[in-house]
């Protein structure tokens, strides 16, 4: 009999607790989703490759709630920041992910770019000086001709405007019997992962 009374008492306590638990669950607010309601402002959207890691800071993250009110969120309290790649050094596009925490859920992204750098330090060393055609009447001659200051291990090609002279392996060779005239050598530095292409035209004069 005593055991029966204890059992009834336990059942009554459980029955009283169920509505309270349900009410607490109902009253607990659901997390607000950042998707479609969030604006991210980065300190910078574009960089130029400089062989160093480059990341923008997150200036502001604002959220528009159901009432239409815009709220400024706090990093660490309302969201965390992460980048799509561990290394942010090379040229390319990078994503910045804002992930909700605390009262907020979901995630939104923004992006920024690192542009290729220009080949600013390319110089063409040309030891050839304007020479009279009669100098090449009996035989051709070679002179130093090469591009220096090229970055990023870019491939360099030289294109001559005439078959009467050649540019190869850092030398320009004017062939025997070359005529008077103005010739050109086009120096092309190919683009690489982090550097844009570069082109320069050098004039060769035979008097």
Name the predicted role of every residue range.
Residues 3-24:
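Sec-dependent N-terminal signal peptides of Gram-positive bacterial secreted proteins and lipoproteins
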Residues 25-69, 116-155, 203:
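Solvent-exposed, low-complexity, repeat-rich "mucin-like" stalks and linkers
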Residues 32, 37-38, 77-80, 103-104, ...:
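Short glycine-aromatic motifs
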Residues 42-43, 60-66, 84-85, 90-112, ...:
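Enriched for extracellular/lumenal, surface-exposed ectodomains of secreted and cell-surface proteins
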Residues 67-105, 164-186:
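Serine/threonine-rich, repeat-prone extracellular segments and beta-strand-based repeat modules
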Residues 151-155, 180-182, 196-197:
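Interdomain linker/hinge connecting the two RecA-like lobes of the SF2 helicase core
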Residues 158-160:
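Conserved aromatic beta-strand anchor motif in extracellular beta-sandwich/beta-rich domains
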Residues 206-207:
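Short, solvent-exposed mixed-charge patches
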